[in-house]
Structures are given as C-alpha cells and as structure tokens.
Amino acid sequence: MAEVKIPQATAKRLPIYYRYLRLLSNSGKNRVSSTELAEAVKVDSATIRRDFSYFGALGKRGYGYDVQSLLDFFTKQLNQDTLTNVALVGVGNLGHALLNFNFHQSNHVRISAAFDVNEDITGTIQSGIPVYPMSDMKEQLKLQQIEIVILTVPAPVAQKVTDELVEVGVRGILNFTPLRITVPENIRVQNVDLTNEMETLIYFLNHFGSTEE
C-alpha cells in the first residue's frame, strides 16, 4: 500500500484509536462500531469515519470494524512492531520523571540514553538508563543511531543544544522547554509546554466552566 498523506489532526488521533483497539483486543472483543469507538475515545463518529476513510475500506456497513484487523492495520501505520530508541537531553526534575515513565505503556518507544551536565549523575544509571555527559552527546547519538530526542534542558541553552542536535542528524524533537526552538524545515518539533497548558485550563475554567473543549 502506498504511503497515505493524511491531515495532521487525523495523525494525532491515530494513537488514541490504537490504544483503545488494543484494550478491546485484550478483552476479547471481536468488533466495534464507530459509535462505540466515538463514545470511548471522545471523538464524534463522523470524524472517526472520515479519519478511517483516508486509508480505504476498513469497515463494513452494518457490521462495523473487525477489532483485530483494525488493530493490525494501525500497528503497521504507527510502526508499533518496530522499536524506536529515543534520547533524553536534560535530566533535571522533569527529565527524571520522564526516565521513570519511559513509555511503559508503549511497546515500540524506549528512552535508551540520557545526557546532562551534572557530574553527580553522568556516568550513572538512572531508572535503568545510562546518563552520559553532554560532551558525549553527538558521538552517542550517532553510535546508537538515535534520531528522536526529548528536550528538557533549561530555556537559556535550549537553542544551543538544538543546534547541536541538528548537526548530528536528529529528525524529531519533543520539546518540553518554554522556548520555541528554531530548526530547519526537514526537522519535526512537537512542543509540550506544561505551564501554558495549565494556564489555558485555568482560563477556560474561569471563563467557560468545566465543559470539555
């Protein structure tokens, strides 16, 4: 099957569908309707049908979707059968929390290396992950063929570290810093600003009540 170009909004929903389908499969359920799926993942059924339509005929009218077939399909789409090693750059409080988390609910993503300037933790194993000094970052990323990095360094050094990641060939950055880093067009950045998300939540609660967006 040729690579399918889909809207970014649809792409963001695919992991949500996958996780719920995996729950259904583990519980022994054989089929699911778009209405049932919509109620579970809080996405309206019309949107689900439109999302699925980008990939062709995934279900049957009057029958719904075969859970295992759909799960197998999204497993391939999301590369769930391939292990992706990622690196963590910045092992402060948030970095430590992410090392402890280490995508335990995912079968295909794993933090395999971490980097920091703190000599008290470099050269040690934290939550099962080796922590290297920043001076070893480029060498280790190349050696371990890591192309995706989680960035949790202080904001003042975020762009400098990003530039080094670009030089070594990193293709994707999950950016937890408040700085909107600058990268070439061929590099994908996902920004996760916890402070901004909390302030947005407080604003909506104060002005619109508790209705979900």
Curated annotation (Swiss-Prot):
Keyword Membrane annotated: no
Query: Where does this protein reside within or beyond the cell?
Result: Cytoplasm
Q: Return the annotated DNA-binding positions.
A: 16-55
Q: Which Gene3D superfamilies match?
A: NAD(P)-binding Rossmann-like Domain, Winged helix-like DNA-binding domain superfamily/Winged helix DNA-binding domain
Cited Pfam families: CoA_binding, Put_DNA-bind_N
Q: Which UniProt keywords apply?
A: Cytoplasm, DNA-binding, NAD, Repressor, Transcription, Transcription regulation
One GO term under biological process is: response to redox state
**Which InterPro entries does its entry note?**
CoA-bd, NAD(P)-bd_dom_sf, Rex_DNA-bd_C_dom, Tscrpt_rep_Rex, WH-like_DNA-bd_sf, WH_DNA-bd_sf
Q: List GO molecular-function terms, semicolon-separated.
A: DNA binding; DNA-binding transcription factor activity
Subunit composition and interactions: Homodimer.
- Which protein family is it in? Belongs to the transcriptional regulatory Rex family.
PANTHER family (UniProt xref): REDOX-SENSING TRANSCRIPTIONAL REPRESSOR REX, REDOX-SENSING TRANSCRIPTIONAL REPRESSOR REX 1
Name of the protein in question: Redox-sensing transcriptional repressor Rex
Organism expressing this protein natively: Ligilactobacillus salivarius (strain UCC118)
